[in-house]
């Protein structure tokens, strides 16, 4: 009786297994370790890590049920948009509406997008890929995935890994830059919080107004901003509590799980282990640093023009990583003076950064698509 076919079937997985697959499985294990042990952005790094392992044992996004998930949620941009609905339902824009000048910091915090775009072009990346890499500077995973899936789907895996990894490393990357760019005297500046009252009507009208205004200015950003704002409208209307809680919990959690698995499933050894991936990861770090530096410099400028009434630390909050960046700036201020509370100011800048990242990503998508 010839059992060679049985032996061939039993060893099929081993014969197609390469050293590259082993390395990528190790990468997946590292991502899972960072999620479990260090608790770095665990809701995303854990499924991305497991998806990476799956991709290198024959369950990539090219075949089987992972292809169904990838096609349904990544190619259609559904998962990033569902996540934005959940994020919008979590965000309180009242600190920003009470301090409209914080919008300036949200704009300054997007400098890394365009600075990294230019750097990627200098390194030889075509415009569509350079733009996708630049959007890592939004420090906003859903925006990076949304733009990347349209402009450079082949680079989606390293772009997503870079965006979420650096977002989780905010407490490690930002503090040295913040201390280097500001003096102790600046970090000790106390900011009075005497906000103008924000009415319920304003909170309800705001998401509607922003959706219309941004969609007219940057039509390609319309899906992102509409998803973010419908989530916020659920929160602020106070009449659909079940939908608001569902957006904040079940919807965003399920979308995040499947998005992480789908992105991880694209991390096959043959497409991930190359110099280009290392360059993307390096450029992503540069984008993050440029965002922080630009925000701090603008914060220092606002400090000068306000007569020393604005703590420059809040400039580092003008990125999309909500609420981590805001909390970090507040903690840095309290390390110098335990009674220095700048949290609400920092949150105002942080929510401005969330809006700024969506608008900047949409404008970039529109400009590149038009060329």
What do these predicted ranges mean?
Residues 1-16, 22, 176-205, 239-245, ...:
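Intrinsically disordered, low-complexity non-transmembrane regions of multi-pass membrane transporters
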Residues 2-16, 37-38, 50-78, 233-259, ...:
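Hydrophobic transmembrane alpha-helices of multi-pass solute/ion transporters
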Residues 12-24, 68-83, 129-137, 164, ...:
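Structural signature of hydrophobic alpha-helical transmembrane segments
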Residues 71-76, 85-90, 104-115, 119, ...:
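Alpha-helical membrane segments and immediately flanking helix-loop junctions
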Residues 93-117, 268-295, 346, 350:
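Entry/N-cap segments of selected transmembrane alpha helices
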Residues 155-172, 283-290, 312-317:
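Alpha-helical transmembrane segments
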Residues 165-239:
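Membrane-embedded hairpin module used as a gating/binding unit in multi-pass transport
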Residues 210-295:
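Transmembrane helical segments that form the transport core of multi-pass membrane transport proteins
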